[in-house]
UniProtKB/Swiss-Prot annotation:
S-adenosyl-L-methionine binds at A35, G36, H37, D55, F84, D105, Q112. It is found in: Cytoplasm. Specifically methylates the N4 position of cytidine in position 1402 (C1402) of 16S rRNA. This is Ribosomal RNA small subunit methyltransferase H. Transmembrane segments: none annotated. NCBIfam families: 16S rRNA (cytosine(1402)-N(4))-methyltransferase RsmH (TIGR00006). GO terms for cellular component: cytoplasm. Its EC number is 2.1.1.199. Belongs to the methyltransferase superfamily. RsmH family. It holds the Pfam family Methyltransf_5. It catalyses: cytidine(1402) in 16S rRNA + S-adenosyl-L-methionine = N(4)-methylcytidine(1402) in 16S rRNA + S-adenosyl-L-homocysteine + H(+). One of its GO terms (molecular function) is rRNA (cytosine-N4-)-methyltransferase activity. GO terms for biological process: rRNA base methylation.
Length: 316
């Protein structure tokens, strides 16, 4: 692994093992990141199996080309540099119309958080950026400096669930009238100034939820996850499985809802029989999310909010 892209994989064995890997199957890692899940999944495949890896961050792909070299040399890996919302079109272009399993590790990866110049973290001073795809046009700077007050309030409430969204948006509006807000530290200080003193004494950084909200907006994370998971459920072969790791309530709620819609039937109660074409195509593998073990929680602080949900295809 390259030094620049160190990433501790969360729920490594649980996520892959729950896919019930077939050695000669076709699998997708929709969020390559540090390639931890990919490496473990590939170790379960024979040379007839294949893994398609998506990431929009070229640095993640460069790292994986080193880490997964032995499997690449055997022709077992294909990298796709694109947003996973384009899952189906990319796979179809490669002649893949059905898959045996897919995994998602949603949210920002550790290397992106740790790389100061990417501008994701309130803990390190950097230019406001937060793009997972460095070729994308919209940045955190654009959101903070150009979004109208009402739009800032909307995304802070919707994606950050911060009860001081209005006060924070007003402080941002006032500050940018004097000069543009350019760095993560500047923004974090403005957020802190908008919150009452008793809030600042609470556990956790006062800027965490707002930084999350801006990051989700910049990368359209929830929109992309919604589209991609729906495409994944469609692509799965019968008995194929999908594993999704989430790190905050918005992602988990979305995943839970998508799985629920696919695994339940929307018909009037009391019908003596449900027609074949109305039967659900998906079944939940775990009704309650799988959480990290105590051992993992102690070893990796970033695993604390992780939840794993798994579903399987039961008919086409």
């Amino acid at each position: 692994m390259t030094n620049e892209f160190h990433h501790v994989t969360v729920l490594l064995h649980e996520t892959v093992d729950m896919l019930d890997i077939k050695p000669d199957g076709i699998y997708v890692d929709a969020t390559l990141g540090g390639a931890g899940h990919s490496s473990y999944l590939l170790s379960q495949l024979s040379e007839k199996g294949h893994l398609y890896c998506f990431d929009q961050d070229q640095k993640a792909i460069d790292n994986a080309q080193v880490r997964l070299k032995d499997y690449i040399d055997k022709g077992m890996v294909t990298f796709i540099k694109d947003n996973f919302r384009n899952l189906k079109s990319n796979l179809e272009a490669l002649g893949v119309s059905e898959i045996d399993g897919i995994l998602y590790d949603l949210g920002v990866s550790s290397p992106q958080l740790d790389e100061r110049e990417r501008g994701f973290s309130y803990k390190q001073d950097a230019k406001l950026d937060m793009r997972m795809n460095e070729e994308a046009s919209l940045t955190a700077y654009d959101v903070v400096n150009t979004y109208p007050y009402n739009d800032l309030v909307r995304i802070f409430f919707k994606y950050g669930e911060d009860k001081f969204s209005k006060q924070i948006a007003r402080k941002i509006e006032q500050a940018r009238q004097v000069k543009p807000i350019e760095t993560t530290t500047e923004l974090a200080e403005i957020i802190k100034s908008a919150k009452p003193a008793k809030e600042l004494k609470k556990k956790g950084h006062p800027a965490k939820q707002i930084f999350q909200a801006i990051r989700i907006e910049v990368n359209d994370e929830l929109g992309a996850a919604d589209e991609s998971i729906q495409e994944a459920l469609d692509l799965l072969a019968v008995d194929g499985r999908i594993s999704v790791i989430t790190f905050h309530s918005l992602e988990d709620r979305l995943t839970k809802q998508l799985f629920k819609e696919a695994s339940t039937v929307d018909v009037p109660k009391g019908l003596p029989f449900i027609p074949e074409d109305l039967q659900p195509k998906v079944a939940l593998v775990n009704r309650k999310p799988i959480l990290p073990s105590q051992e993992e929680l102690e070893a990796n602080n970033r695993s604390h909010s992780a939840k794993l949900r798994v579903a399987k295809k039961i008919r086409k």
